[in-house]
Amino acid sequence: MAGLAVAALLSGCAGSGATGPGAADPGVAGPGEAAPSSSAASASPAGAFPLAVSSCGVDATLEEPPERIVTIKSSATEMVLALGAGDRLVGTAFADGDVPAELAPAAADVPVLAEKNPAQEAVLELEPDLVYAGWESNLSADGAGERQTYQDLGVATYVSPSACKGAEHRPERLTFDLVLEEITEVGRMLGEDEAAAELVAAQRAELDAVVPSGAGLTALWYSSGEDVPYVGAGIGAPQMIMDAVGLENVAAGVQDTWTSLGWEAVAEANPDVVVLVDAAWNTAEHKKEALERNPVTATLPAVQEERYLVVPFPATEAGMRNVPAVTDLAAQLAELEVAR
C-alpha cells in the first residue's frame, strides 16, 4: 500500500488547478505533543493572494502562486511534485535518494543544481520566486545563502516547519497532524489547494487503515555511524513513525529528533527489532554488516535472528513519504516472527 495515497492523488489531479508532469491515534496530537501551529497561510481562505506565510520565524509574502520554484532536499522536491506543480520546478538540489516511482516522470527533466547545497548565485540565476528548503540550515551562510538576502531581492523562502531549530518555532514533538498541515500550507502557497486536500485525505485514510503490528515490541532506529550510532530519538519523524506501527523506541526518552547512543546502551536496551535507514551513502546492508561484526551487538537476538526493518532515507524526514513509510513498516513487521 506504500505510495497509494500519492498515486490516488496523481490520478485525480487532471481536473484541478495547474497541471504538471508529474499508540494512540497517530494523526492526532496527544498529551505532550504539539498541536498544529497556526500561520498566516493556514488562516487565509483558499486561493487568496497576496498570501503571507511564516516559517521558522521568517515572514514572506507571495503576491501570486509561484511559477519558478527551487527546492532543496528531497522532502521539499517531492512535496511540490506530489501537489502537481512539477512543471514549475526550475531547479532542485540535495536529493537524499530516488523519488518515488509514481513521481519519477514529473522529476525527470528538472535541472539538478548540486548534490548538496547549491551556491546562492546558481539559485538566483534561475530567477526563482520561491525557494523551498527541507532544512533550516539549507538557507544559511553555509548553505544556499541567507534567507534575508533572498527576501531583499524579492524572492520568497519557506522552510519545512518541522525542521526549525529555534525552540520557539520547533514542534515539541512531530505529529502526523503537523505533517499534513504542511501539505495543506504548501498547497495553499502553490495555489494547489484542491490537490493538497486530496493528498491529506488520502494520507489520513491510509494511516487509519494501518494495523499497529509492532505492538509490544521495542526497536532501535539506526540511521548512521559505526563507532557511535546515530539513532532516531523521541520527538522527530522516527518516533512518530514507530508510534504509528506500535513500536517502543529505545531512545524515546531523548528529547531530540536524533541522538548519538553508545553501543553499550543499545546492547542494554536489547531491542526486539532494528529499523535500518537505507541511504545511498550508508546502505541498510552496510549497517547489517556493522551490527554483525561489532562484538557488542553481534550477540543480540535481533541481530542473530536478522529482525530487521528497512526504511529509505527520504522517508525519515517530515514530509509526504512518512505515511507510506508507516504502511511499509507495518507490512514488514507483520512478516517478522518475534516472540512477544
What are these regions (language model features)?
Residues M1-T77, E185-Y222, Q332-R340:
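Bacterial Sec-exported substrate-binding components of ABC uptake systems
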Residues V53-G57, P111-E121, A141, V254-W263:
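Short helix-initiation/N-cap motifs at beta->coil->alpha
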Residues R68-L126, L130, W135-L139:
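A short, structured surface patch at a secondary-structure boundary
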Residues K73, W135-N138, S162, V277-W281, ...:
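Short secondary-structure boundary segments
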Residues D96-D98, V231-T259:
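Alpha-helical, coiled-coil/dimerization segments enriched in small aliphatic residues
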Residues D98, S137-G145, V155-E185, G216-Q239, ...:
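Extracytoplasmic ligand-binding site segments that recognize negatively charged/polar headgroups
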Residues Q120-A133, W263-A279:
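Proline-aspartate-enriched helix->loop->beta-strand connector
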Residues R173-E182, V273-R340:
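Structured C-terminal subdomain patch of bacterial secreted/periplasmic proteins
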